[in-house]
C-alpha cells in the first residue's frame, strides 16, 4: 500500500475515510445529495488531517479511494484521487475549520433549506419546538463549563446568504455571518442548500438532522399560516382554516 | 462478561436490549427520532427490569451497551453506560409503568404529532376510520374478558398537554391525563412529540404506528377542509374544492 | 416436519408462503399495512390451496409459520397457526377467488385510497395517464385471445363502497360491485383502504402498485384544481393558480 | 453457457447487464418505475451493444436474464429473453443513441414529471437554483474542450411533448425536440413521464436525479406562488402568504 493510501484505509467504520462514505450514502437516500450535490469534510482528531469528498462523484457510490486528504497546517494535499477534482466547497470548509474550530462540516442541497431560503428573508427563524434543544446556544454552562444547548423557549436563528456563480465566491459572506452570528452552527445559502458544522462529525450530523427537521416543520407551519417563530398559544389565531 | 453486561447481552432478537436498538433504528428511518430525539423503554417480562435508551445518543447507531437497566422495585440502576446520561424522559416512562401498568413506552418527535398539536386544541380527535380499530378502547369484552379495541364508528381522542422547558416537568400534566383520560394509551405533547404505551412492546409499537397513521391522515383531511372527526357522509360538504 | 408444516416450508422464494411474507414486509415500508393493517392471500397454482395472512400480526415481521392454508374445495383450514385468528378479510378474499377467478388478493390501508374515498363519491376516476395502461380493461384481444389493458385514452373507474363495523359485512356490497363493475380488478372501501386482485400474485401486485400511483397522482391533481378525469389539454383552465 | 448468455453474465457490477438491474431496483424504490413502468438502456462502451430492459417486467425484480441485447450496427437482437417482449420504448431509445450520441437512456414515470407536464405548457423552466449546475449546457469550454454545465444564473428548459396511445408514436415529436432543443438531455412526455440521456450511464443517472430534484422543487415553488424561473429576489412578491 502506498503511503497515500494508508491515509484512507482503515477497518474502523468510524475512521473519517469510512465515515464520509457511509454518511454520504445515508444522506443520498435523504434526497440531500442526489445528482452529485453536497459533500462532507471531517478532520481526523488524531492527525488533524482534513478528509474531503471530491467534486462530481455520485455520493451514494463514493469509496475511500475517492477522497482528498489535506494537511491542516500547510493546506497541501497529502492525497489526491486521480479521477476527481477537489470540491469547489473546499475554501468554505477550510473557513469553518479555521474560524469556527469545526471538527466536521456537512453540506447538503436539502430541498427544505432551499424552500426556507425562498420563503424567509435574511434569517431562518423557528421558536418553541422541542427539537430546538438539539442545537447549541453558543453559551457555556458556568458550572460544568460544557456547551449549552438552546432551550425550548429560545428562537433558533440561522443566517441566509445569497448564492454566487461559484462556491468559492461565498467566502466573504460566510465570514460576515461568522461575525454577525457568532453562535450559529449553520448557514443557509439561498437557492442552493445549507452548510452545518460541529466540533465532531457526530455533533455536526446531529445538528444537521435537527435543523433539517426544523426547516421541514417550519415549511409545514408556514403553509398552514402559522409563523414558525410565533408565541406558544398564538398558533390558532394564525391558522388559515379553523381548528377542527 | 461482567454481571452488568449479562443484563444486555442476548442472542434473542426479541430480548429488550436488542429490540430497543432494532426499533430505534427503524423509527429513525421514519423521521421519528432523528437528531437524538425520542426514545424507547421496555420492561423485561421475565425479570421486571426496565430497559431504557440513554439521552443524546444517535438512535440509529445505538447498541445494547448504550442502555440503562433499572430495577422496577428499588428504581436503582442495575447498569449504567459510561458515556451517557439517563434520558430526561425517565420519570415519564416510570409513571407509565407504575400508573398504567405499561410493558413498554415509545416516545417520538413525530412531525405528525407536532403538527396535530398546533392545529388541535386540548384533544386530538379522529373518527370513522378503519385504522382506529387498532387502538384499545379500555373496555373489556364481558365474555372473553379480553381488552376490546375501538370500533370503526368510535372517535379516538388523545389528550394534548403543554410542553415544558424540561421533560421531567411534564409529570404533573401526565398524571392529570391519566385521570381525565383513563383509557388513553397515548399523550401528545404540544410542539414536542408523543408518548405511546402498551402492555407489551409489540402492542405499544402497533398503537404508535396506528396513531401516527391516523395523525398523518387527520392532517391531510384538515388541509382539504374535512374535520377529522366529522360524520360519515359529511365529508363532501366540508371539502374546500368541489368533489371531482 | 409435520404434514401441516410441509405446506408452508419451501426454499423457493416464489412459493406462496414465502412470497406473502416478502410482500407484506415490502408493503409495510410503503405505509400500506402498518399497525397490523392490510393483508395478502395467494392461491398456490399447483395445489389450489389458499394461503392467508392472519389477523393482528405485524406485517413486516410475519413468517411462513404465521400463515393459514385453506383447501379451495372444502374451504377447510389445512393449517392454522396456534397464535393467530384468521383475518376478518377471509370471506372477502374467498369471494374474489370464487367470483373473479383471482389468483391472489392484496388488501392495504393505503392513505391514498382513504383520501380518494373522502374526495370522490361512489367511483374513483382518472383518465389519460400513461400508468393506466398497467390496468386490465376486461376485454380480450380478438386475435391473440389475451387480456387487453386499458389504453392511454381510457378512464379508469374503481367503485367505492361504504365501510362497515366488521369486514365480513362488506360482502354484499362487494358482490354488488362484481355485478356493476364486471371488469374492475379493485374495490375501494371508504375510510378504510383498497382490495386489488389479479390472476396471479405478480399481476395483483402490479395492478395494486399502478392503482396506488394513480390515486396518489389524482390527489395531487385535485389539490391543484385539475379534475383527474379531465380531457387532455383541459388542465390549464382548471389550475387554481396560473401556469408559470 | 450459451453464446447469448455470455453477453449478460459478468462479475463486474458496472457491466451494463448488472447495472441496468441495480438501477431499476433503485429507481423502483424512488417510485419512478412501479407497476412495470419505466426502463433503462445502456450501450456497452466496449462492444457498442445496446442492453435493453424488457416490457412488462417488475423493475425491482429484474435480472440480467431478462434483458435484450441488440447490435448497434444491424439493429438485430443478439439476445432475446424467452418470457418477455421488447419494450415499446425501444425505437425512442434508438433515436437517442443515433441522433444524440447517447451512451445510456433512462425512462421513468416520475410523478414530478407528470405533475410538471400538467402545470407547464410546452416547456419546463426553472432558473437560479444550484442544482441546475449538474445539467449540461451543450456548450464546450473553448480552452479545455470539455462539455460545460449550465451556470447558476441560467434557465434550464426541458421540452414537453404530447403523449400518444403507443410509445413508438412519440418518435416524430422526439425528433422535433432534437431540432428545437439541440442542447437538451431530456424530454418530458405529458401525462406520462420523462426520458433522460447522457454520454454514459453515470452521466444519465446524474442528469435524471438532478432534473427530478428540480421538477420536485419547481412544483413546491409553484404551490407557494413562486414562478420557478423568476428572478433572484423576486420570490417574496409572488408568495401567496406573507413571508414569516
Swiss-Prot record, chains A, B, C, D:
| One GO MF term | methylthioribulose 1-phosphate dehydratase activity
Q: Which reaction does it catalyse?
A: 5-(methylsulfanyl)-D-ribulose 1-phosphate = 5-methylsulfanyl-2,3-dioxopentyl phosphate + H2O
What are the protein's UniProt keywords? Answer: Amino-acid biosynthesis, Cytoplasm, Lyase, Metal-binding, Methionine biosynthesis, Zinc
Pathway the protein acts in: Amino-acid biosynthesis; L-methionine biosynthesis via salvage pathway; L-methionine from S-methyl-5-thio-alpha-D-ribose 1-phosphate: step 2/6
Q: Which cofactor does it need?
A: Zn(2+)
* SMART domains associated with the record: Aldolase_II
> Origin, by domain of life?
Eukaryota
- Keyword Transmembrane helix listed? The answer is no
Quote the Pfam families the UniProt record gives. Aldolase_II
The enzyme's E.C. designation: 4.2.1.109
| Annotated residues for binding of substrate | 89
A single GO BP term for this record reads: L-methionine salvage from methylthioadenosine
InterPro entries xref list: Aldolase_II/adducin_N, Aldolase_II/adducin_N_sf, MethylthioRu-1-P_deHdtase_MtnB, Salvage_MtnB_euk
Co-factor binding comment = Binds 1 zinc ion per subunit.
Role description: Catalyzes the dehydration of methylthioribulose-1-phosphate (MTRu-1-P) into 2,3-diketo-5-methylthiopentyl-1-phosphate (DK-MTP-1-P).
Name of protein: Methylthioribulose-1-phosphate dehydratase
Which organism's genome codes for this protein? Answer: Saccharomyces cerevisiae (strain RM11-1a)
Gene expressing this chain: MDE1
Amino acid at each position: 500500500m502506498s503511503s497515500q493510501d494508508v491515509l484512507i484505509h482503515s477497518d474502523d467504520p468510524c475512521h473519517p475515510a469510512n465515515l464520509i462514505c457511509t454518511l454520504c450514502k445515508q444522506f443520498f437516500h435523504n434526497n440531500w445529495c442526489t445528482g452529485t450535490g453536497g459533500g462532507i469534510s471531517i478532520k481526523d482528531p488524531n492527525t488533524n488531517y482534513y478528509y474531503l469528498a471530491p467534486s462530481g462523484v455520485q455520493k451514494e457510490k463514493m469509496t475511500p479511494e475517492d477522497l482528498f486528504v489535506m494537511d491542516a497546517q500547510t493546506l497541501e494535499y497529502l492525497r489526491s484521487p486521480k479521477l476527481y477534482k477537489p470540491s469547489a466547497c473546499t475554501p468554505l470548509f477550510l473557513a469553518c475549520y479555521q474560524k469556527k474550530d469545526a471538527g466536521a462540516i456537512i453540506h447538503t442541497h436539502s430541498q427544505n433549506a432551499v424552500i426556507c431560503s425562498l420563503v424567509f428573508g435574511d434569517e431562518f427563524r423557528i421558536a418553541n419546538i422541542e427539537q430546538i434543544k438539539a442545537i447549541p446556544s453558543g453559551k457555556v454552562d458556568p458550572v460544568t463549563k460544557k456547551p449549552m444547548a438552546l432551550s425550548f423557549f429560545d428562537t433558533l436563528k440561522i443566517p441566509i446568504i445569497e448564492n454566487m456563480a461559484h462556491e468559492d465566491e461565498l467566502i466573504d459572506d460566510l465570514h460576515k455571518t461568522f461575525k454577525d452570528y457568532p453562535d450559529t452552527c449553520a448557514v443557509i445559502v439561498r437557492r442552493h442548500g445549507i452548510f452545518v458544522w460541529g466540533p465532531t462529525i457526530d455533533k455536526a450530523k446531529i445538528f444537521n438532522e435537527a435543523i433539517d427537521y426544523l426547516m421541514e416543520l417550519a415549511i409545514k407551519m408556514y403553509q398552514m399560516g402559522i409563523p414558525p417563530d410565533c408565541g406558544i398559544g398564538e398558533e390558532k389565531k394564525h391558522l388559515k382554516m379553523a381548528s377542527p
